[in-house]
Amino acid sequence: ALLDQGDLIAAMSIEGQLGTDQTLRSQLHQDLRPHPGQAVSANNMFSALSGSEIIASHRHGDGVVQDAYSLRCIPQVHGAVRDAVAQARRVLEIELNAVTDNPLIFPGLEGARNIEDQIVSAGHFHGMPLALVMSYVKAAIPVLASISERRLNKLVDPATNDGLPAFLIGNEDGTESGFMIVQYTAAAIVNDLATRAHPASVYSIPTSANAEDHVSMGANEARHVLDMAQDLGKVIALEIYTAAQALEFRKDMINAARQLASGHDSAALASKINGAPGTEDADYAAFMAEVEALRAELAEAAEYTPGRPVAAALAAVRRHIAFMSADRAMDGEVQRMVDLVEHGELLMAARAAQ
């Protein structure tokens, strides 16, 4: 469920960032680079963006050739994490159905001369199969957390968020910090996850007077994975918190432009555009033709909305947390977001809307 929620919230960030859905098309992943997890994540996000008027509004002619890696390469990164977890699951299922006792007793063993010959002291108890896949998952967790934090950072940074307010707060005098501390928090958690990703399985310390001279430390690895997965959920919750704010701004900005265009003639609309040429300039006529075309297009456009699953997830967020129009205490809201992730409420809302 945590992986599916990561895909859903990545889709919300794509909407807020004005990213494209074309990199999520199934033929790119199933046909050309068919890693199973990659195809699943791409399909999850493409479905979450279905029906998005925001995505459709800038599909052509926005001048963006390639999105940043944290948007364009989500299926490849999320998918690799999925495949790591899938491998761990395969090993766990084998272990759950395996015999790991010691010694092992084989009554009637062919060639056995006595009862002692029917008893084999083997090594099925050794935890290395589990330890190594836990190390694999430990390495994957900060990878997923890191790309989530990078998307969050893009949404709050005015240099990269494509016109959204700095730190997603509407003041222009710089007196409010908005979602700045949310990014600080995510960065701190990601750093902590990265420092804990070092594999315990590569450090064997002999026990039992060297009778057990090579051990897996698998229990430590499993405990680390449990704790780290909880912190990964916190990073995903912080991205949801931020992406919901960004998406509200994005919707309002696009719809405000539509309303502005429908309520003004071309000359009035042109007067509100920074850097517009004067009436005596040589390129004024061409500029006005472009303004008229823009006005007509915006005036006829329907209200811009995100994809249906993303919109449902956003509505679920808003049932618990209001849009932030001014700085306020955020600790309680962050905890509510963590609880929403833990209980899977946003994912259930999104799936019901598909």
Explain the meaning of each model-derived region.
Residues 1-354:
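C-terminal auxiliary extensions adjacent to catalytic cores
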